[in-house]
Amino acid sequence: MFYDQARIFVKGGDGGNGIVSFRREKYVPEGGPNGGDGGDGGNVIFIGDEGLRTLVDFRYQRHYKAERGEHGMGKNMHGRNGQDMTVRVPIGTVVKDAETGKILVDITCDGQQYIAARGGRGGRGNAKFVSSTNRVPLIAEKGEPGEEHWLELELKLLADVGLVGFPNVGKSTLIASVSAARPKIANYHFTTLEPNLGVVRIAEGQSFVMADIPGLIEGAHTGAGLGHDFLRHTERTRYLIHVLDISGSEGRDPLEDYDAINRELALYKPELADKPMVIAANKMDLPGAEENLARLREKLGEGAVIFPISAATRQGLEPLIYHVHKGLEELGPVVFERVTADAHMDVRFTGKTEERFKIHRDEQGVFVVTGKEVERHVAMTDMENEESVARLQRIFDVMGVDQALRDAGCQHGDPVRIGDLDFDFIEYAAQYAERDDDGENG
């Protein structure tokens, strides 16, 4: 099995910040808070597209970031939500977490959507923090950071185009010239023992997969050489390019080669003869090529589609590739096998309540608190605002973070880390005792 792979980074947009603002109008001495909320960040969304065949475009762009939400404004004005970023992927793409290798989703149908990175929630403005005990709140939340991940994309490659022909006619050179494939190339028969696959990129969003089918010999349909293995690969292609050594540099007659290969294809499976096929008259840069090309045209007549090329010098390759691409478009999209997602794919809810946070002590002796909820609260708190910090402390008390730190052995003055926040653990009883000692000594 052959796979196209890509590693990309996705990040949802950060939420916009809420703001602290108060109504200020003439004759309204107690206008009250009117700080608006920040907008939500946009999501990064994968969309299945039956028109795409490869992952080649992800080699040119690896980072995908959605737009962040706008900050809130006064007069209770809500910041605009960030725009989603849509990323089109071929049908059959499997998305994995790059760190764990866990399968996140299998894109199995056209139009299927998957949120690869969710945008952060917009922070609340101070108008949302009014209460009976706090009529003039000076608190506003920062926007929640958007999710970010490194992802592995994997796509099972099915060759659109197969190169057929005798050994040493230049198939490997041709596929190396029109794609990023780098097959082993040498001047002897059966250099290629396994199909070499290359992705031919026409333009952004337009590409196809070409397979260098190992060289055939007469009697291949009976299993001679590696005939059955080689011919089996041609069944999976939609379009064939018959590569001829038109110069006859191997001492064979290219016209006889043409008849022999077509005969082997028809004898193995008659329906192979019905596949669309063009002829690539290769090695036009060598002596004798022009004469043999004229003989071939005379033999096959005006209806034959022949492209004189030299894979070694890249002569005539562009017309051949564009003709094949147009032919594939006329054949229409491939009908893909629908894959049933495994139980571990794209699970939204398992019915199991996860721990709200975990605590461990790292090698430097720092108590590290991890958990999506606690890290979100830290990220959305303005650490320059005393009221916001006090509110964060109350949240931690309610969640039981302080008590859990004590249970883990954390003592007054020990270092603690939550997300990007580093601080020293403070036992308020000890803090007050220190203040009393300072007062007595003063």
Curated annotation (Swiss-Prot):
Q: Which UniProt keywords apply?
A: Cytoplasm, GTP-binding, Hydrolase, Magnesium, Metal-binding, Nucleotide-binding
Give all residue intervals belonging to the OCT domain.
Answer: 349-427
Q: Which cofactor does it need?
A: Mg(2+)
TM regions (residue ranges): none
Chief subcellular location? cytoplasm
Q: GO biological process: any one?
A: ribosome biogenesis
Asked whether the UniProt record includes GTP-binding among its keywords, one would answer yes
Q: Which residues bind GTP?
A: 165-172, 190-194, 212-215, 282-285, 310-312
Binding positions for Mg(2+) per the UniProt entry: S172, T192
Pfam families recorded for this chain? DUF1967 (PF09269), GTP1_OBG (PF01018), MMR_HSR1 (PF01926)
User: Per the record, GO CC terms?
Assistant: cytoplasm
Give the source's domain of life in one word: Bacteria
- The Obg domain sits at 1-158
Any single GO molecular-function term of the entry would be:
magnesium ion binding
Q: Which InterPro entries match?
A: G_OBG, GTP-bd, GTP-bd_Obg/CgtA, GTP-bd_prot_GTP1/OBG_C_sf, GTP1-OBG_CS, GTP1_OBG_dom, GTP1_OBG_dom_sf, OBG_GTPase
**Where in the cell?**
Cytoplasm
Enzyme class, top EC level, equals hydrolase
Which residue intervals define the domain OBG-type G in the entry? 159-329
The record's disulfide annotation reads none
Q: What is its EC number?
A: 3.6.5.-
Q: How does it assemble?
A: Monomer.
Explain the purpose of this protein: An essential GTPase which binds GTP, GDP and possibly (p)ppGpp with moderate affinity, with high nucleotide exchange rates and a fairly low GTP hydrolysis rate. Plays a role in control of the cell cycle, stress response, ribosome biogenesis and in those bacteria that undergo differentiation, in morphogenesis control.
The family note in this entry says: Belongs to the TRAFAC class OBG-HflX-like GTPase superfamily. OBG GTPase family.
Protein name listed in UniProt? GTPase Obg
Underlying gene:
obg
